[in-house]
């Protein structure tokens, strides 16, 4: 379910302010953020944002195709290592 149109997209104010400040200064550096629920805005294109995934920050380079999506979509929080194999399938006898 998407957010109400009258409210508009959510982005953490501090994150957007830092991106706009970097755009004005024409600098590129990695921005760390814990705000996985922030929507990617067009001003963020070309920047690298390190999104927290629960343990560490995952650097994500923002492209035009990502605009409108959430930052958390590109930093998975769960790692799947596969099911434990049975002794029959492992080949050891």
Swiss-Prot record:
GO BP annotation list: ribosomal small subunit assembly; translation
Keyword terms, alphabetized: Ribonucleoprotein, Ribosomal protein, RNA-binding, rRNA-binding
GO cellular component terms listed in the entry, alphabetical order: cytoplasm; small ribosomal subunit
GO molecular function: rRNA binding; structural constituent of ribosome
SUPFAM superfamilies reported for this sequence: Ribosomal protein S19
Source superkingdom: Bacteria
Leader sequence segment: none
InterPro entries, sorted: Ribosomal_uS19, Ribosomal_uS19_bac-type, Ribosomal_uS19_SF
This protein's record includes keyword DNA-binding: no
Gene3D superfamilies: 30s Ribosomal Protein S19, Chain A
Entry similarity comment: Belongs to the universal ribosomal protein uS19 family.
Role noted for this protein: Protein S19 forms a complex with S13 that binds strongly to the 16S ribosomal RNA.
Name of protein: Small ribosomal subunit protein uS19
């Amino acid at each position: 379910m998407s957010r109400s149109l009258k409210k508009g997209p959510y982005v953490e104010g501090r994150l957007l302010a830092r991106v706009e400040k970097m755009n004005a200064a024409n600098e590129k550096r990695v921005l760390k953020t814990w705000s996985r629920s922030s929507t990617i805005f067009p001003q963020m294109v070309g920047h690298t944002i390190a999104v927290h995934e629960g343990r560490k920050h995952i650097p994500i380079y923002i492209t035009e195709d990502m605009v409108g999506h959430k930052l958390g979509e590109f930093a998975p929080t769960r790692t799947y290592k596969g099911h434990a194999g049975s002794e029959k399938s492992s080949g050891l006898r």
